[in-house]
Structure formats: structure tokens, C-alpha cells
């Protein structure tokens, strides 16, 4: 039974913290609970083991002291007898103290005290092992051991009697530990390589420093008093849970798994509180540990990680799980709305804002401003959503229109060097250039096709090739044909930039410029009866490279008389002819039965009419100017009212003022309003000038 309690003691000691104070207190508690004979046996075994384990010098010094003490004891028998009598008195006094303490500390679970005692056979076996072990020691050690064994032999009978009189569980535990120590000591003679590891065994936790002399092992009355004070401080151990079960199936091993590994290892062992992670890291072929989040998330999720399992739907796998809103952005979760859905949302928001404006106007008798709308959080949200949806609608329409068109390469910046950019961009540009060269014709081929088209058009309309032989209508037709031809060229090759392109296209551009200037010069008509018409010289002809320019001489002023009538007749004739040619020009301008497509319209006739009106104002009298001024003011009020209504509606819908890009639906009205304002300023200047002239005269 003593051998069975020993593993329990070792396992309990494994679970205790290994602090020096606890070790010392545990040692005191064990010593205080044993009998005097057990203490003598403990001192004998400890001295034998220490002499083998510790250094030779210190053990040699101790053995020399012990040999001297043994010699002195053998020489004087009388002194030995007196010392033995004093020791027996001390032991009897100490046994009474221990008996009193055992009555307080013996647990109730130890009902059968006979199981916890050492019998005489075990004592004899212990004596034989001790004598055999000590017999192998050196001469100075043998002298000390023989003296101690003689004391043990003399007190053997007293040992058995004291065990029968005062048995304790701690005594049994101490005896079993000593038996294990002696067996370990016998193994040390065979395996000398495990000396350092056996020092760390839990059965040898109670040991003293080798430098301490052996005299400290002997008990004194002061030490007994000290031990009793320590016993009162150590908490009582409840061993009822361990001793309720009287029999065990298998003995508990003295070493734990981590202790056995540390005994065989060369490195320092880890503490018993080390976590599983350290042991996992020390094992090379171990599987990786699972994170704590795995157990919190649920072990059933491990079956969802296998994508090959049929019962598991795809949306339940972790990699298909939707990200939380805190990790993702709002832009990622936005749904793509179609243009029809965006239009419906815009209309609903506009209705909400309009209802708010009507309610606000009924309450406060004026239309809400932008600050009034911003003060209301709900209306402000509507306004922001409206602007956002409008932007999305615009982008969606632009995206749809871009999908219909072929992709265009981004044009290179002229400020960057040609070496700037990646090789991929250069390769793409080279490929695009090769494709363009293969598709589009050369500049010379395009010019030849344009000239051939112009010749066919002239032949159809019976129009001469020389501009001097053309009438006004033919010049207008030539101008439109040239304009469309040049636009067709620029749509293919762009405006001529290089010197070669300019040289090739120069005759066609010069012809178009000359025709345009002739038409603009013919549109300026002198006014009948105007005194300044006599002094106005015609516009200069365009300067053409390689040709001599001929200029008209200034017309001298004529005196008043019959010559005025001669000037008026050609003026009437010119006016009628110009009006007729202008009408023909407009008719010809609307004719688009040509092979070329023009993206822009020519607005020269409108300029002619504006110039004619302004020149008439200079010749008008003061009453005519005043009447014209009144008409312009009425027209200005009408257009201004129309524009103001448009701006108010825009502000109610969008919550902001009209910007320049928002004036596209009313572009004509804005342009007309600008011209009327300029005309009003001109009329005011003319009237003030006429007033000053009349006053001066």
C-alpha cells in the first residue's frame, strides 16, 4: 500500500507551484508529522544519496568531518551513552508533540491505519539495501555510514514499536519516498549519465545545497519549535477525495508525459504550465492548431468547407459569404439602375420637392429659397438624391451611346516626349497607326476625289470654273460645295498640319477663302441718301500669293446737285440685285443633294440682315430712333420674362441657379436678349449724339 500511495504523492507534488517557500514549508510539514525513528532513517538515506550526487570536494570535506565525529564517538563510549540518552529524551518529547499535531491533521478518509504502516520486513529490506549501497562507498564514507548504520541497528526494535504506536499517513508517504530514493540511488551506480536529470525529479524536491554541512541535518529543539510555527502557517490538505477509493486498477506513473520527455532530453524542460502551442511548435510533424475563433464559430462549419459534399449548397460556403457593411463600402453595394428606373425616381423626387414648395408658399407667402430647403433635412436629402440620380442618368446615357461607337484610342499629349509611356501603349499606338494607314487613303488620293466631285457638280449646274465669270448665285453655290469638300477631307485626315499636307491642300483652301470674302464684301450695301456712302470706299480685295493686288482709288466727294440723282439710281439697282441674290443664296444653301455632309451651317445671310438694320439706324431720324427704342424695350421685357420663368422653374426643380451649360434649351432666347441689349445701347448713343448735334446747330 505504501508503494501505491507514492505515485499519488508525486502527482500532487507535480501540481504544486515550485516556489522555494512552498518547498521549505512542505518539507517542514512532512518532518513534523513523522516519528523520531523515521527522522533518523531519513537522515541516514539523505546523507548517503548526497554523498553520491554532489561534488567530491564538498562530500569529501563532509566525510572527513563525519569520520572525525565517528572516531570520537567510538573512542569514548561514555560520551556516546550520554548523547543517546539525551537524544531519546528529545525523541520522546517530540513524539508527544507530533501525536498532538496528528490528531488535528489526520484526515477522516484514513479509517484503516494498518494500511499506512511499514512492517518489519520492509524495514529489514530497507536496511539491507542501505547497507549494500553504503558498502560500495570509499573508506572515509564507510566510516560515517557504519556509525549511522550501527545507530539504525540499535534502534530497529524501537522503530517497529513506534510505528505500531503512532502511525500517520505522512509517515507512510515519507517511507515510500525513501524506498524510491534508495532504488533510484542503486540505479545511479549503473547509469552515471543521468545525475543532472535526477536532481529535477519531483521525489527529490526536498533537498539542501551540497555546501551545507551535515550538522544541519541533525534536529535541535530550536528547529522543532521553528517547524511547529511553520506547520501552523501551511494550509491543511484534504485527502479524502484521494483515499475514498480503496483500490485502483493500475498504478499512476510517477512521471508525467512532459516530465519523462524532460528526463530524456538534453535541453532544459519547459514548465508544466506551458501551453499546447509550444508543444505543437516543438513537434515537427504535428498538424497546425485550430484558432479559438473556430470553436466560437461552430464546429459544424467544418463540413461546409468541403466544396465536394453534395448536401452543401454553394451559398453556405465561407468564401461565398457576403461581406459585412462595416468592411465594404456603400459604392460596392449600390444597385445598377436602368435609365427608366432612374427617370421614375427623378420624377417622384421632383413631385415631393414641388409639394414641399407649394406647402411652404401657402404658409409663408413666398417661394422657398435654397437655404430654406437646406434647413429641412428631408428636403435636403431629396435634393441630393435628385442630383445624384440625374448624374447617374446622364452617365448611363453616355455609356449607352459610347457602346454603340467603336473604341477610340486616347490621343497623346503633345507636351510629353515620345519615349514617355509603357511598351504596351506604344505597341497599341503602332497597331492603330498601321490599321489607319491601311484603311484611310492618302492625302493626294483624297484631293483628287474631291476635285473630281467638284468638277461633276459644276458640270451639272453649268457653273464656270473661273470665279470672275461666276454670278452671285454661282459664287454662293461654289462656296457651299467647297465648304463641304473641305469638311469631308478634315473628317478623314484632320486639319493639315505637316508641310507636305499644307502644300497639297493650299489651292483648295485659298479658293474657299477667296469665294467667302467675295460674298461677304458684296453683302455690305450702301444706304440710299446717306451722305457717308459717297465717302465709303469698297473693301480691299484679298491678297493672294503670286498675284498682283489692284486697289480701288478713293472716290472724291462731290458737291450737292444733280450728281446725287446719278448716285441714287445705281444704289437702287444694287439693292434690288443684292436682295435677289440673297434669296437665291438661301435657296441654294438649303439644297443638300450633294455627296458631302456638312456638320455646320453658314449664317452669313443673318449677318447681312443685321448689318443692314444697324446701318439703317445710323441714317434714321430722332423720332424714328425713339420709336425703335420703345419697340426694343418692349421686346426686351418680353424675352426677359420668358427667361425668368425658365430660371425659376429650373431652380424649383434642381434647387440651384442656372449655370452656363444649363442654358441649352433657351440658347436662342439668351442670344436674342443679348443682341437686343446691344441694340438698345446703340440707340441710346445715337439719340444722345443727335441731341448734342441739334443743340450745337
UniProtKB/Swiss-Prot annotation:
Bias (Basic and acidic residues) ranges: 86-103, 170-197, 398-407, 424-433
Biased composition (Polar residues): 146-169, 412-422
Modified residues (Phosphoserine): 19, 271, 291, 401
Keywords, sorted A to Z: Phosphoprotein
Extent of Low complexity compositional bias: 58-78
Keyword Phosphoprotein: yes
Region (Disordered): 1-21, 52-112, 133-229, 307-338, 398-433
Classification via PANTHER family: FAM13 (PTHR15904), PROTEIN FAM13A (PTHR15904:SF18)
Family statement: Belongs to the FAM13 family.
Protein name: Protein FAM13A
